[in-house]
Amino acid sequence: MKILLDLLLLLPLLIVCCLESFVKLFIPKRRKSVAGEIVLITGAGHGIGRLTAYEFAKLKSKLVLWDINKHGLEETAAKCKGLGAKVYTFVVDCSNREDIYSSAKKVKAEIGDVSILVNNAGVVYTSDLFATQDAQIEKTFEVNILAHFWTTKAFLPAMMKNNHGHVVTVASAAGHISVPFLLAYCSSKFSAVGFHKALTDELAALQITGVKTTCLCPNFVNTGFIKNPSTSLGPALEPEEVVNRLMNGILTEQKMIFSPSSIAFLTILERILPERFLAVLKRKINIKFDAVIGYKMKAQ
């Protein structure tokens, strides 16, 4: 009975918050400056990580770029330097906790306190449960979520001490809506979304108001990791479009970014619609991509 009374008492606040959100739709939010900020981006040698580095370089941030691919990392760094940015590169295996911690120690000693951390590195294996090797499942979790814990543990304390910073989680629409034949990937991205939400709540509980969090959840992105993706929602997104949304979200301190925006609507539908209807809807959306299927149906 008490909870019902509490909910009724909160009703005026709900109305005020809804009106406030509606008004904000028509008022462009001021973008913060990131000039001079030390920005560390994992997975910076390709795709979203590379393009995000370019955007921060244009905004005069100091860049710390991590990737396991030395050649890709050097290409990204060269372009960023051409844009006038100060750039530091580290070849780091984000599936290796000790490599992350030792590299983080070097960054703090040689460059300074990271104030914007972009956890972007990721791997994906397009296969069903039986065709996905145990080592691939382990690596998916090591890179796609455990690395977020290790990097954040390494760099968040300085942000909290200064009450200034930003932790960015690059997740996926597959962290909200499951997809067949991406079992390990979906599981890791659901974890990444949960990491972002729990970290956000933890910072609020500790009254650390100056450290912001942002989570990016795009649909299929045309980066070459998933072969021949298609859905009835439209073609795979170009990475430039996704990074534009990401940068706008970081600079305006948005908590959750969906790309395209319709993904947000689908996440709501999944929570309120009957399961039978959802099954039909998912068939209509018709997500397809090249995948290895290990399960063999028995002959009838």
UniProtKB/Swiss-Prot annotation:
GO terms for cellular component: endoplasmic reticulum; lipid droplet. Substrate binds at S172. One of its GO terms (biological process) is steroid biosynthetic process. Residues 1-18 form the signal peptide. GO terms for molecular function: estradiol 17-beta-dehydrogenase [NAD(P)+] activity. It holds the Pfam family adh_short. NADP(+) binds at residues 40-67, 189. This is Estradiol 17-beta-dehydrogenase 11. It comes from Macaca fascicularis (Crab-eating macaque).
